[in-house]
Amino acid sequence: MNERFAASLAPALSYYAALSPAAGFQGRCAMSIPADIEGKRVLDVCCRKGKGAFALADAVGPSGYVIGVDPDTDNVAAACAAVPKNHRAGSSWERHLRFSLAIPENLSQACIEDASFDLVYINSVLNLAWSLPVALAEFARVLAPGGRLWVAQGVFAADDLDAQGERAVIGDGADAALGNDVGLPGAGA
């Protein structure tokens, strides 16, 4: 990474550092895991204290690998400390699971190379990205050909919103988040 790009990320580092450590990343923490990831290389972005990465590591099995990255050093330390008692591999977990410090916009902080993952997994934190376009470009960089981006993001609406209304809200939210580069059929006005 060149120095100019690294300097441009200084505001991102400040942004992530300012997020409340007591509340952490706020979002819906339900977790859906793809059924077909055994043996895959998975990157868990903004893994917090590792709970999801543990489940992903169990799902990829002994022939797969999971790296959890988070912008908070305390979260990374807590995840590393918790793994031996939470991952089925016990003390040999390092062969299947690793945690590292990195922001979504700069995964090279964790020495993550181009085209090195089959799945980039983001659970309920994409809305907190400092720069969504830069983060999405970084996810594309680390995905291997044929790799997938798995985004689990809660959308909440009033109870009386009908199905078409929910679809419009989701579409409008996606359009807004991506600068109107993406749209869902039937979304928007």
Predicted regions and their residues:
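Class I SAM-dependent methyltransferase SAM/SAH-binding core
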Residues: 41-44, 48-108
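A short glycine-rich, Lys/Arg-flanked "PGG" loop and its adjoining helix->strand segment in the class I
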Residues: 133-148
